[in-house]
């Protein structure tokens, strides 16, 4: 049996770049492996956006500067969306991403410290449930590793 470096699952690298719009299905282990990268990219985008938001608030009456800052804001957010999509995660809102498990989503919103929630495909953020509860009750196939506490 070939050795593995822990970064591969289902025959593909966990960090494989996806084509825009390409949906990827994650196991819990795979999602947890890529989660630190998702969290770091998101934190960087949030940090990059902070001074832009401050400038927008300070220049509410100055239309040309405000318009320029709005464009910069949109560029930062779009770069973040593109990076998330290339990682195979679903962007559900600003700083809100879902990892598709095939029967639902592992759900995370910045600045939560862990990937700790789940909701079904037909549900949204408001119906998300603690991940440990879902694993305990449903024992889903995608939960192929010991839950983190």
Where are these regions (language model features)?
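Long, non-globular targeting/processing and low-complexity regions
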Residues: 2-16, 75, 88, 108-111, ...
